[in-house]
Structures are given as C-alpha cells and as structure tokens.
Amino acid sequence: MDAGELAIKTLEAHLIKGVTAICGDVEALTPKEPYDAMVFCLFGRTEDTLRIARKQCRGKIFLVKRDYSHHRFSAGKVSLGEYTAGSTEAVLHEKGVPYTVERFTAEFGQSFRSLEAAERFFALYNRSRSETLSKDEIKACLTAGPSEKFPYYLPHEKALCLFTIETAAISKEEAV
C-alpha cells in the first residue's frame, strides 16, 4: 500500500504472485481479513507501525528503518529523532516485543539533469536552519551521472535495518 499512484503502477508492472498493490492511506483502508504480512519501508514512528500492524495483520511485519541518526542532506547536523533503527530497538525493548534485525546497505543515490537541479535538491532537503552548502560544496559531492540526460549523480549508500516481528507478539493495547 502506498499513497503515491506512480509507486503502485510501478509495483503492479512487476507484481509478484500473491501480492496486492493498493493505493491509499494504510490507516484508512483496514482490510476485511487481516493481511498475512505487511512491509513498512521508512514509514513513520514505531508506535504507529505497531498499532496499525496489530489491527491489520495476522502474520509477520517487516520494518525497514534508517540505521543512522542524522539527516544526510543537511548542511548542519540535524537529528532524525525517533525515525531510526536505534529508536525502533528502544521502543521494542520497552514494550517487550521480540524481533530479529538484519543490517544492510542499499544505494539510494539521486541523478540530476543539471547542477542547478542538484542545488534545488539540496535546498529542498536541507533541514538545517542555519547552514547551507555552497555551489562548490554541492559540486564536490557529485559524480558522473548514468547518462547524457542525467550527467550528475549524488551517491548515497543508505545504512538500513530490517526488523521482523510476529504480530501475535504485539500486545492488544498497542492496537488502541
């Protein structure tokens, strides 16, 4: 389930048998029958995920969380707060929810048509209120892009964690 129609169309084009793509708000679209499994990729607070999963899933849930603590595209050091693997582990320990976790990395880079597009990207995603990157600093972050159409690339190896949780281990109080 995703709120973005393009994501759903892309998934449907490569659909795996037995997987259903749904466009909408996960909290508003409660299934008639609980799902066998749910995947929450870089999705919200752990408490919200547990609440949704307890109501909507009878099997395993998979949480993909960032395994770093600060925003990657900000000029200054800006905390991600409770949207990290460390925060998720703390919540699961506090609530006594057993889980397994696997750490891995994935390339989450961004291609750009121009240096100006890269500058707009950094301006948009900079969460630092007091610091900005100069044009030269931005250019220094870029490598050769994948094609003539996209001559610039910002490599970004993202450290992630995959948490696996049985929904039966989530207390009924979490579903409220």
Feature annotation, model-predicted:
Residues 81-103, 122-129:
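Short alpha-helix
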Residues 43, 64-68, 80:
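Short strand-turn motif at the edge of the Rossmann-like AdoMet-binding core
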Residues 30-37:
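A short acidic, Gly/Pro-enriched loop at the edge of an enzyme's catalytic core
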Residues 102-176:
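Conserved Class I S-adenosyl-L-methionine
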Residues 43-58:
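A short, conserved alpha-helix within the catalytic core of class I
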Residues 1-28:
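Class I SAM-dependent methyltransferase SAM/SAH-binding core
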Residues 57-73:
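Conserved beta-strand signature within the Rossmann-like core of class I S-adenosyl-L-methionine
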Residues 25, 37, 41-43:
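Short catalytic micro-motifs in class I SAM-dependent methyltransferases
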